[in-house]
C-alpha cells in the first residue's frame, strides 16, 4: 500500500506504509485540532499501539503515554481493572478492554483512553484461540469491539493496532457530530 496526501506527508511517509501510519496521523491531527490528548493501555500489542502514535511528528502534543500491562495482575494494579472482573472473566474480555481504556485515560490524565487485550498466538490462552481480541476507546463511556483475527502472531498484533486506531478514529468522528 502506498499512502500519500497530507496525513502521510505529516507522518514522514513517501512510499509503502502500513495502514496504521495513515490512521495514526489522522488521529494526531484531530486530537491536536481539538486540544485533546490520548493515553494507551496495551496487552497483546506490547507497545505497538504507542509506537504507531509516536511515529507521527507532533504526537508529543497529544500523546500522554501508555501502559503495557502484559501480565494479568498489572491490569489491576497499574490500570485499576477490577479484580472481580478479572477473576470472573479473565484478561480476555471486552469489559477488561473497557476498564483498561478508562484506567489509562484516568491515570495518565488524558482526554481519551485506547486499549488492547487478547490472544496473539500461536497457542490458545485462557481457552481462547489466537486472534481473539478486544479493543476499547473511552472519553466517557467506553466503546468496545470484539475481533476474531486470522494469521500469524505478528499479523494479529499489527491488525489489532489498525483496528484499535480505526475504533478511536470512528469515536472521534462520532464525537464531532
What are the residue ranges of the model-derived segments?
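Short alpha-helical segments enriched in small residues
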Residues: 2-177
Amino acid at each position: 500500500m502506498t499512502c500519500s496526501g497530507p496525513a502521510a506527508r505529516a507522518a514522514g511517509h513517501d512510499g509503502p506504509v502500513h495502514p496504521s501510519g495513515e490512521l495514526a496521523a489522522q488521529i494526531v491531527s484531530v486530537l491536536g485540532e481539538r486540544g485533546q490528548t490520548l493515553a494507551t493501555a496495551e496487552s497483546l500489542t506490547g507497545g505497538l499501539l504507542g509506537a504507531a502514535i509516536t511515529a507521527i511528528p507532533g504526537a508529543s502534543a497529544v500523546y500522554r503515554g501508555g501502559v503495557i500491562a502484559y501480565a494479568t495482575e498489572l491490569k489491576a494494579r497499574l490500570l485499576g481493572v477490577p479484580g472481580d472482573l478479572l477473576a470472573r472473566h479473565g484478561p480476555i474480555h471486552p469489559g477488561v478492554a473497557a476498564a483498561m481504556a478508562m484506567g489509562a485515560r484516568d491515570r495518565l490524565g488524558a482526554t481519551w483512553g485506547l486499549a488492547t487485550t487478547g490472544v496473539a498466538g500461536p497457542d490458545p490462552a485462557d481457552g481462547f484461540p489466537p486472534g481473539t481480541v478486544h479493543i476499547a476507546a473511552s472519553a466517557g463511556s467506553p466503546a468496545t469491539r470484539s475481533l476474531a483475527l486470522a494469521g500469524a502472531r505478528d499479523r494479529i498484533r499489527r491488525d489489532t493496532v489498525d483496528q484499535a486506531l480505526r475504533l478511536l478514529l470512528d469515536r472521534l468522528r462520532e464525537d464531532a457530530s
